């Protein structure tokens, strides 16, 4: 498998030589730690070599340099992932020396390729320009609040997995190709809010647009460009092999094509892999047998090897980094919308059989990734 992946990478070297991406673009290895505050409130503790540790400091000490955090508009079903909770997460990340990425969901709940529900507070707004202003003002006010706390993020995601049209009514949700006249107006409003605030304060913030799975990004960014959505800095991708048409060795093809076409660096802003198929609580796990790839068993070593392989491929293709989704979402007594416990403890970086002791997956942060892998 190693030779196969390296050979595929070598073929791409000529193609990625002229991506238009600056040579000084940083390469991030990070984690989405949005769940940590809630997990600790629910009684979770985290350990490294048997000793209790602060999870943010642990990730920083292990080499993580970027923390991603989601923000919901007004989630009445939980007290987490609101501005107060997000501010706490950003502060903990910055105090540990890591940079931050703020992920605006523009919803009161989860957004993803299947749903992009408008916040209840905006549901009455039918005029696109008026809705765009509400989005602009909310984005600006959020950044201003964080800035006052000296918590302004380094990167901002304008939407989360926006494969379908954003800010849709739940009872009239439309999948498939977005209404680009409306969608472009709304997305550009969010982008403009970030740009204007950055310009006003003189504080740089990179804009990320985020699509789930590389095969969707190829058509989405083409249509976005055709409809005037062009002012962004980073192409963000979710990459989960279970749900992608692209196998791991094929991923650099998509990264190279996106970077060659749009001259923007590509970052994997979500990925994950199970270290076991065992379920430790009543909440069903999202990543089960179908998530397991032949080359990477569902084991601590398999999880690490997947991450090392993925990150090397992204680096070799000229990508900007890899962020692991919710490696600290461990099992607790608390409930989600769907069950009691965690739906992700078998894909976390902590061993549920050893009181949440750190797993080998942490080694992926400090691995020596080469900018250009050579075929063997």
From Swiss-Prot:
Binding site for Ca(2+): 281, 285
GO molecular function: arabinogalactan endo-1,4-beta-galactosidase activity; glucosidase activity; metal ion binding
Cofactor note: Binds 1 Ca(2+) ion per subunit.
EC main group: hydrolase
Keyword Oxidoreductase: no
Secretion signal, residue range per the UniProt entry: 1-17
Active-site annotation: 161, 270
Thermal dependence summary for this entry: Optimum temperature is 60 degrees Celsius.
Enzyme Commission number: 3.2.1.89
Pfam families hit by this protein: Glyco_hydro_53
InterPro entries, per database record: Glyco_hydro_53 (IPR011683), Glycoside_hydrolase_SF (IPR017853)
pH dependence of function: Optimum pH is 7.5.
GO biological process: pectin catabolic process
Keywords linked to the UniProt accession: Calcium, Glycosidase, Hydrolase, Metal-binding, Signal
Cofactor(s) needed: Ca(2+)
PANTHER family to which the protein is assigned, alphabetical: ARABINOGALACTAN ENDO-BETA-1,4-GALACTANASE A (PTHR34983), ENDO-BETA-1,4-GALACTANASE (PTHR34983:SF2)
Name of this chain's protein: Arabinogalactan endo-beta-1,4-galactanase
Species this chain originates from: Cellvibrio japonicus (strain Ueda107)
Gene designation: ganB
């Amino acid at each position: 498998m190693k030779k196969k992946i390296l050979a595929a990478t070598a073929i791409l070297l000529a193609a990625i030589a002229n991506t238009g991406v600056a040579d000084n673009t940083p390469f991030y290895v990070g984690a989405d730690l949005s769940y940590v505050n809630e997990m600790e409130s629910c009684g979770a503790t985290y350990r490294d070599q048997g000793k209790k540790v602060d999870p943010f400091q642990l990730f920083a000490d292990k080499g993580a340099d970027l923390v991603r955090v989601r923000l919901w508009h007004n989630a009445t079903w939980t007290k987490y992932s609101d501005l107060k909770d997000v501010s706490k997460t950003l502060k903990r990340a910055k105090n540990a020396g890591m940079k931050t990425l703020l992920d605006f969901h523009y919803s009161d709940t989860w957004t993803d390729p299947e749903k992009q529900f408008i916040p209840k507070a905006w549901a009455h707004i039918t005029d696109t320009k008026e809705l765009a202003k509400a989005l602009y003002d909310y984005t600006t006010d959020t950044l201003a609040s964080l800035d006052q706390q000296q918590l302004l993020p380094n990167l901002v995601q304008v939407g989360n997995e926006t494969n379908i049209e954003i800010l849709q009514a739940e009872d009239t949700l439309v999948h498939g190709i977005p209404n680009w006249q409306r969608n472009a107006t709304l997305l550009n409003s969010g982008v403009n809010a970030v740009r204007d605030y950055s310009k006003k304060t003189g504080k740089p913030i990179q804009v990320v647009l985020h699509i789930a799975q590389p095969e969707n990004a190829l058509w989405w960014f083409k249509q976005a460009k055709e409809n005037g959505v062009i002012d962004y800095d980073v192409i963000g991708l979710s990459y989960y092999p279970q749900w992608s048409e692209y196998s791991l060795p094929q991923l650099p093809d998509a990264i190279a094509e996106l970077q060659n076409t749009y001259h923007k660096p590509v970052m994997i802003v979500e990925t994950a892999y199970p270290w076991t198929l065992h379920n430790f609580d009543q909440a069903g796990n999202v990543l089960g047998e179908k998530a397991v790839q032949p080359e990477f068993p569902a084991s601590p070593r398999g999880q690490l090897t997947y991450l090392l392989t993925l990150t090397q491929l992204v680096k070799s293709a000229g990508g900007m980094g890899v962020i692991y989704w919710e490696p600290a979402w461990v099992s607790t007594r608390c409930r989600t919308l769907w069950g009691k416990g965690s739906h992700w403890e078998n894909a976390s970086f902590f061993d549920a059989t050893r009181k949440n002791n750190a797993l080998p997956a942490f080694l992926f942060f400090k691995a020596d990734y080469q900018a250009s892998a050579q075929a063997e």
